[in-house]
A protein has these predicted regions:
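Conserved "HGTGT" condensation-loop signature of ketosynthase/thiolase-family condensing enzymes
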Residues: 1-76, 100
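Conserved beta-strand segments that form the floor/walls of ligand-binding pockets within enzyme
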Residues: 4, 79, 110
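Short glycine-rich or small-residue beta-strand-to-loop segments that form or flank ligand, phosphate
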Residues: 76-83
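Acyl-thioester C-C bond-transforming condensing/cleaving domain
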Residues: 66-72, 86-164
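Cofactor-binding loop segments of dinucleotide-utilizing enzymes, especially the Rossmann-like FAD-
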Residues: 8-10, 83, 142
Length: 164
């Protein structure tokens, strides 16, 4: 069996923090300095009640909506990568599996590997496919780093946002 990506999509929270917003909090920096240093102008930030699993769930729902040829009941494994899990048990992948209405026979696994997580997720998915364990893997990522960063941590606040 050949492993390949059928479709990709994303979900962004509504709240946007701009470089201008950050300069108001950290006046020792300029909009230009932030843009030149990190190449980012806007960061999407999750609402207080919005979780990493919520963002990933929205991305998955969007994927199924944008690609009707991909059927939910064809997914037999879900992988969810996050550094900012909502809770320890149950795993977020299981919660997402249930909310999407995926088959109960579908495998579900959370993993966390920082910035390299997506690449490792692709490798895990490929292994599941080539090993004959799964035929269709749904790989999701979701992060709400903003909930874990100190408000005065300008280095990380200029780089990280939230998304699924």
């Amino acid at each position: 069996m050949k492993a390949f990506i059928k479709a990709i999509t994303y979900s962004l929270p509504d709240l946007v923090v701009t470089n201008e917003d950050l300069v108001r909090e950290f006046p020792e920096w300029s909009v230009e300095k932030i843009a030149d240093k990190v190449g980012i102008n806007n960061r999407h930030i999750a609402a207080e009640n919005e979780t990493s699993a919520d963002l990933a769930l929205r991305a998955a729902e969007k994927l199924f909506e944008e690609h009707p040829e991909i059927k939910k009941d064809s997914v037999d494994f879900i992988l969810f990568c996050t550094q900012s899990p909502d809770y320890f048990l149950p795993t977020s992948a299981c919660v997402i599996q249930d909310k999407l209405g995926l088959p109960t026979s579908c495998g579900a696994l959370d993993f966390n590997l920082g910035c390299s997580g997506y690449v490792y997720g692709l490798s895990l998915a490929k292994g599941l496919l080539l090993g004959g364990i799964a035929r269709n893997v749904l790989l999701l990522t979701g992060e709400t780093y903003s909930k874990f960063m100190h408000p005065k941590d300008k280095g990380n606040r200029t780089i990280f946002g939230d998304a699924g």
